[in-house]
Swiss-Prot record:
Protein name as annotated: Trigger factor
Pfam families xrefs: FKBP_C, Trigger_C, Trigger_N
Keywords, sorted A to Z: Cell cycle, Cell division, Chaperone, Cytoplasm, Isomerase, Rotamase
One GO term describing the cellular component: cytoplasm
Species, as recorded: Mycobacterium bovis (strain ATCC BAA-935 / AF2122/97)
HAMAP family in the cross-refs: Trigger_factor_Tig
Gene3D superfamilies: 3.10.50.40, Trigger factor ribosome-binding domain (3.30.70.1050), Trigger factor, C-terminal domain (1.10.3120.10)
């Protein structure tokens, strides 16, 4: 088999393939064997009919069509493997010559990962916000802790912000009751902003068994986005009593003996949280700095696939009713054209980031090991509250292991870029990033997830590189 590659653009190629007819002989033999099992010819046992008679029964051209259709995927894959292109998505294949006894010729046009010239990472400079911790931050954490240990006491007075109320809700649209919007005995903390927009303002000042009607847009269901008349009835009012922030509370809520020790611990927690936020800021700033210096050509089909995914997610809550989706956008002061423009811009940026990090991983020869996949499995399984083995099975069943593999590889690439760059805060202080991205899972967790990850490493790596 011979193949050549034509560069149609930085992101698209045409692969010209010529397959000698003799190389199709094994394909013919396999097809004849399968047909012999299916076609009954007088005088021959099942599976024993000669190829010539089968060909006469089916027709030479029909046989050739079947052989070519079956052979195209493997011959295309072979041509890709023999070239240095990295396809993105499905190819557009056109058979240009198909005659019995003659060489098979076809072309395959496909988008590819573009070649990207990367800058010197050691010359990269990144600046982010400094970490600042004030007493207000610690006070907020302490207040949250006091709330967790607070007690609720029934009170006979109108509702105030901070109270916890039991409420009934019902709604109508144009005078029609909406059954799915009705609920009884809901517990709600006034001022939290949860449940329905406008609810907090509506209940403030009401006493038990009093009602009020307010207007709100429904968030889900067949009336999603429509204005509804919502009736809220308060059934009970409870006041949250918070413990005093003293040494006794510190001993109740923590392992510390004094409130000062507890505040110091909360300050450390705030610092760790802000360090995590800073690490994410550094990561994004590093990618943005690279994108400013690098030209990343965009494969149109890849961008379109990303855009289609965004649109699919947006429509999923409306049963993929595009007409209703367009109406909802107008009601929100937007339009379908504006949504499409924003979604395409976001899709283009996302594709640029992916292609940049893939090129960076290639340049740095990033290798994804079992420990890297274990770390991702353990971290992700914690977020969902499931076991690593269970997550692995879920990903494997849905063929999402290659996606996880690619994500881990990109993350390792950006870690390497951050380590090579000079990172400072806006005050000019150099930031040590060595502790930001290098945390490994414990030996026990790794051992627990190890059987899954051996399979993950093999399956994901194999599929991601095909």
């Amino acid at each position: 088999m011979k193949s050549t590659v034509e560069q149609l653009s930085p992101t698209r190629v045409r692969i010209n393939v010529e397959v000698p007819f003799a190389e199709l002989e094994p394909d013919f033999q396999r097809a004849y064997k399968e047909l012999a099992k299916q076609v009954r010819l007088p005088g021959f046992r099942p599976g024993k009919a000669p190829a010539k008679l089968l060909e006469a029964r089916i027709g030479r051209e029909a046989m050739l069509d079947q052989i070519v259709n079956d052979a195209l995927p493997s011959r295309y894959g072979q041509a890709v493997a023999e070239s240095d292109v990295q396809p993105l998505g499905r190819p557009n294949i056109e058979v240009t010559k198909k005659e019995y006894g003659q060489d098979l010729q076809f072309t395959a046009e496909v988008d590819i990962r573009p070649k990207i010239s990367l800058p010197d990472l050691s010359a990269l400079t990144v600046s982010v916000d400094p970490i600042e911790i004030g007493e207000d931050d610690v006070d907020a954490e302490l207040q949250s802790l006091r709330t967790r240990f607070g007690t609720l006491t029934a009170v006979d007075r109108p509702v105030a912000v901070g109270d916890v109320v039991s409420i009934d809700l019902s709604a109508t649209v144009d005078g029609e009751d909406i059954p799915n919007a009705a609920a009884e005995g809901l517990s709600h903390e006034v001022g939290s902003g949860r449940l329905i927009a406008g609810l907090d303002d509506a209940v403030v000042g009401l006493s038990a068994d009093e009602s009020r009607v307010f207007t709100a847009k429904l968030a889900a269901g067949e009336h999603a986005g429509q204005e509804a008349q919502v009736t809220v009835t308060v059934r009970s009012v409870k006041e949250r009593e918070l413990p005093e922030p003293d040494d006794e509370f510190a001993q109740l809520a923590s392992e510390f003996d004094s409130i000062d020790e507890l505040r110091a611990s909360l300050s450390d927690q705030v610092r760790q949280a802000k360090r995590a936020q800073q690490a994410e800021q550094i990561r994004n700033a590093t990618i943005d700095a690279l994108l400013e210096q690098v030209d990343v050509p965009l494969p149109e089909s890849y961008v379109q696939a990303q855009f289609d995914s965004v649109l699919h997610s947006a429509l999923s809550g409306l049963n993929h009713d595009e007409a209703r989706f367009n109406e909802l956008l107008v009601e929100q002061g937007s339009s379908r054209a504006a949504f499409d423009a924003e979604a395409r811009t976001a899709s283009e940026k996302d594709v640029k980031r992916q292609l940049l990090l893939d090129a960076l991983a290639d340049e740095l020869q990033v290798q994804v090991g079992q420990d890297d996949l274990t770390e991702r499995l353990v971290t992700t399984s914690r977020q969902y509250g499931i076991e690593p083995q269970q997550l692995f099975g879920y990903l494997q069943e849905r063929n999402q292991l290659p996606t996880m593999f690619a994500d881990v590889r990109r993350e390792l690439a950006i870690r390497a870029a951050v380590e090579a760059a000079t990172v400072t805060d806006s005050d000019g202080n150099t930031i040590d990033t060595s502790e930001f991205f290098g945390k490994r899972v414990s030996a026990g967790e790794a051992e627990e997830a190890e059987p899954a990850d051996e399979g993950a490493a093999r399956a994901a790596s194999d599929e991601a590189t095909t």
